[in-house]
Amino acid sequence: MRTLLRALPGIWLLSGGAIGAEFRFEAVSEKSLALWEGAKPVFVYNYRVIRKEGVPADRARSTYLHPVYGLDGEVLTDDFPKDHYHHRGLFWAWPHVKTGGKEYDLWMIKGAEQRFERWLVKEAGQKALLKVENGWYAGAKKIVQEQVTLEVHPAEADSRAIDIELVLTPLDQSVTLAGAEGKSYGGLTLRFAPRTNTVITTPLGNGQEDLPMTRLPWADLSAEFAGAKQASGAAIFVAPSHPDFPPMWLTRHYGVLCLGWPGVDARTFEPDKTIRLQYRVWIHRAAADAGRLKQAFSVYEKALATGR
């Protein structure tokens, strides 16, 4: 039996949508674009500035995914969490961005911000492809061109893969990036929604300690989220072609997985030289153990090697 679920403001969906349904994009507002697979929501890409009542005005942000949904319609991500207002679903930002003798903070959105410029590709059918051009701006000055590609594969019985490519190009002047001192965060980040029974699994195991400045090819967070009858979660896989593979991470059991590249050691990039970063976000039903995660990472490696 199918039941109605609340998915997005003003939008309802039927549970139990069939695997193999086609993807479609749908505007949520003049600021946000939703992706659906059949009757099931996949994510919302917020490309214009999002604000929240009661939150300091300088926490306004754009260029991130939230909500990101599990396979049963549960919301996996959080936005404007009270403990870290600047956290924003699935996002990519650096706390130290230096150029032209000045330093900016994309992570805390201080002095610089990411801005949407144009859609490059928006295709939906048996799979979905979204390619966006953004800019990093310090006031009116654009310092980095950012191209984001999201390739979403059809849901399988118990998982879904979202491939992400970030291409960053410094413009007039060199740009130096660095992660947070003593922690390494800075780069792709996934902030999870409130949940219970959290387990973070990496190739090092699934202990309860947080991992700062730790080199990993992948990390997963599994838990019980509101709206789901069983545990679920999401992993981030890093492409073997990634610079300095495996990169540093920061994992936190309060609910965040943070890539840390280039990590605590700053790296300078010259104008017009592109930086290419590839990842897969692997969403799954049930808690994922190390064996299942290793197998899914192997599938990702093979897909990259064959171009599929």
Question: Which residues does each PLM region occupy?
Answer:
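Sec-dependent signal peptide recognition
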Residues: 2-10
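Cleavable N-terminal signal peptides
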Residues: 7, 18-19
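Beta-strand-rich N-terminal accessory domains
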Residues: 21-86, 165, 178-180, 294
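Acidic (Asp/Glu-rich), glycine- and aromatic
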Residues: 45-48, 56-58, 155-201
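Extended, loop-rich substrate-binding clefts of extracytoplasmic carbohydrate-active enzymes
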Residues: 85-158
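Beta-strand elements of well-folded, non-transmembrane domains
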Residues: 134-138, 150-154, 168-172, 192-196, ...
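Trp/Gly-enriched beta-strand surface patches
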Residues: 184-263, 268
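Beta-strand-rich recognition/accessory modules
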Residues: 234-308
